[in-house]
Swiss-Prot record:
Superkingdom of the source species: Bacteria
EC number(s) from the headed UniProt entry: 2.4.2.29
GO molecular function terms listed in the Swiss-Prot or TrEMBL record: metal ion binding; tRNA-guanosine(34) queuine transglycosylase activity
Lineage start: Bacteria, Bacillati, Bacillota, Bacilli, Lactobacillales
Protein name: Queuine tRNA-ribosyltransferase
Cofactor section: Zn(2+)
Gene3D superfamilies, per the entry: Queuine tRNA-ribosyltransferase-like
Binding site for substrate: 96-100, 151, 194, 221
GO terms of biological process kind: queuosine biosynthetic process; tRNA wobble guanine modification; tRNA-guanine transglycosylation
Reaction equations catalysed: 7-aminomethyl-7-carbaguanine + guanosine(34) in tRNA = 7-aminomethyl-7-carbaguanosine(34) in tRNA + guanine
Region of interest (RNA binding), residue spans: 252-258, 276-280
This protein's record includes keyword Zinc: yes
Gene expressing this chain: tgt
Length: 382
């Protein structure tokens, strides 16, 4: 077995679910799990400083390989001393492979071949090519603690035969990426399980990848349009296929109920742009549900956004002030709203970890969902 750059330590299993309390040890520090990871697509979490992210308890952040490859360029980042030094972040960083962005830009399935993928840049329209070796090379230059193998991410509702061929290609690409990885002593590489909603294909993908001894395993191809029930069903049969001594990462998931349901099914790590993206539109997560701060009813509301939240935003500013800032397109409003939403999800996971320790995660979920409004008719996803 390979001596990996990152290690997972299991602390406790919850008695009534598949939830796990643990920690992940990386070259840039250790963080507790389950953990939500804020997304810093272009080497910054939008509107947030590294110091603020540390204050709210973000033990690890995510950056995007595709975007950093195009701008400023992975070789420039390497010259700067790696992503940690470039962005002044001394804690763990995870980078994705760029695959998800690439497939959103592919104009024809014929451009996906065994060798790699041809697509056009979203910046200037020039033709680009990315393959498993290049994706690993870029991430080696970036110097992230946790890297992703290059995978094909087909939409959830593709025909069986297409998904089968895609899974088989992803497995071959994973092996190529593993062979191309030139910094295994200080960067851990994860394999990504695909297979859409097909249990046998998820099983095949998990079997292929676990035979290669990656540092950890990601569950991809979810949060791409399927229902919450379908996502949970895939997790029900996929997570048990993954090794218990390795981290499990559910990609692209950030809705509060989905985070809790993922933890119940044995997932350790999550990421999503959701909290910062919706914050910039004035949508906020609170202990009492979703708040659209633009609504007129908050114009004269001089109470805290969330009386159960102790974040900087909620302890210093009112709903009326936040509404004013967002309506006026003031940058400070974007910052305050982003800070709150990130604090909310990071602290939700802290509460989830305590519920695992106390063996009452199912009761915690029931209480949280009732207060948040998930049990109401036509409840919003987030």
């Amino acid at each position: 077995m390979t001596e990996h750059a990152i290690k997972y330590r299991l602390i406790k299993k919850e008695k009534h679910t598949g939830a796990r309390l643990g920690e992940i040890i990386t070259p840039h520090g250790t963080f507790p799990t389950p953990m939500f990871m804020p997304v810093g697509t272009q080497a910054t979490v939008k509107t947030m400083s590294p110091e603020e992210l540390k204050t709210l308890g973000s033990g690890i952040i995510l950056s995007n390989t595709y975007h950093l490859w195009l701008r400023p360029g992975d070789e420039l980042v390497a010259e700067a001393g790696g992503l940690h030094k470039f962005m002044n972040w001394d804690q763990p960083i995870l980078t994705d492979s760029g695959g998800f962005q690439v497939y959103s830009l592919v104009q024809n399935k014929k451009n996906i071949t065994e060798e790699g993928v041809k697509f056009k840049s979203h910046l200037d329209g020039r033709e680009l090519f990315l393959n498993p070796e290049k994706a690993i090379s870029i991430q080696n230059n970036l110097g992230s603690d946790i890297m992703m193998s290059f995978d094909e991410c087909p939409p959830f509702y593709q025909p069986y035969d297409y998904v089968k061929a895609s899974v088989e290609r992803t497995s071959r690409w994973a092996e190529r990426g593993l062979n191309a990885h030139r910094r295994p002593n200080d960067q851990g590489l994860f394999g990504i399980v695909q297979g859409a909603g097909f249990e046998d294909l998820r099983r095949q993908s998990a079997s292929d990848l676990t035979s290669m001894d990656f540092a950890g395993y990601s569950i991809g191809g979810l949060a791409v349009g399927e229902s919450h029930k379908e996502m949970n069903a895939v997790l029900d049969f996929t997570t048990p296929m993954l090794p218990e001594d390795k981290p499990r990462y559910l990609m692209g998931v950030g809705a509060p109920d989905s985070l809790i349901d993922g933890v119940i099914r044995g997932v350790d790590m999550f990421d999503c742009v959701l909290p910062t993206r919706i914050a910039r539109n004035g949508t906020l997560m609170t202990h009492f549900g979703r708040v659209n701060i633009r609504n007129a009813k908050y114009e004269y509301d001089f109470t805290p956004l969330d009386p159960m939240c102790d974040c900087y935003t909620c302890t210093n500013y009112t709903r009326a002030y936040l509404r004013h800032l967002i309506k006026a397109d003031e940058t400070f409003g974007l910052r305050l709203c982003s800070y709150h939403n990130l604090h909310f999800l990071v602290n939700l996971m802290k509460d989830v970890r305590q519920a695992i320790m106390d063996d009452n995660l199912l009761e915690f979920r029931e209480d949280f969902c009732e207060r948040y409004g998930y049990n109401q008719p036509n409840a919003k996803d987030f």
